Amino acid sequence: ILYNANLGGCPKLAVIRDIFVFHCYVGCRVGDLYRLTRDNIKDGFLEYMPQKTKKCQAKTVRVPLHEKALKILERYESSTGKLLPFKPIHQYNLGIRELLKHCGIDRMVTILDTHGYNTVQKPLYEVATSHTARKTFVGNLYKQVPDPNLIASMSGHVEGSRAFNRYRTIDDEMKRKLVEMIN
């Protein structure tokens, strides 16, 4: 939906869309995303060393670039040094919410109310952040190939990461397919 959204009248949103969609295709932390340059693209792969990973566990992450991610990069080939024309993180997060609202992405999500520690339902466009891209990357891959080690190798998570386990949602369709495998 987002990749093909017509944002011709909103160039600011078009840039946010491109950054967010690219982010959903590569799944890195936003800090790593902002550090990327053209030098991080090698033979159709995005290659980088995660910044937040503990030094003793640090290893290079290689993510094959989807055709749509490559097309987004083509739009910004003349960007100055950086891979994409990044905005300050708070502007990026506000832009993501504005983009989702503009595109009518209003799926209700359950979040934890930090004041009363109760769960509340809110439209995605009110709560989405750059982290939503990382979660989307892991969730989409996990629905296709539920192999935590393979996915973690592309998201930069270390084995046994609690954060990684939170991203993996097992939906009803996955459960249905699993039951159908039983003879």
Model-derived regions, located:
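Catalytic-site neighborhood detector that most strongly recognizes the C-terminal catalytic loop/helix
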Residues: 50-54, 89-92, 155-180
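Conserved tyrosine-mediated DNA breakage-rejoining catalytic core shared by Y-recombinases
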Residues: 2, 26, 35-74
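Short, polar N-cap/turn motifs at the start of nucleic acid-interacting alpha helices
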Residues: 39-45, 146-166
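Basic, Lys/Arg- and aromatic-enriched nucleic-acid-binding interface segment
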Residues: 1-30, 34, 88-91
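DNA-binding alpha-helical recognition surfaces that contact promoter or target DNA
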Residues: 35, 94, 98, 140, ...
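Exposed loop/turn and edge beta-strand positions of beta-sandwich/beta-sheet ligand-binding modules
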Residues: 16, 59, 67, 90, ...
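Short, basic (Lys/Arg/His-rich) helix/loop patches that form interaction surfaces
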Residues: 7-13, 78-82, 97-153, 157
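C-terminal structural cap/anchor segments
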Residues: 63-64, 82-89
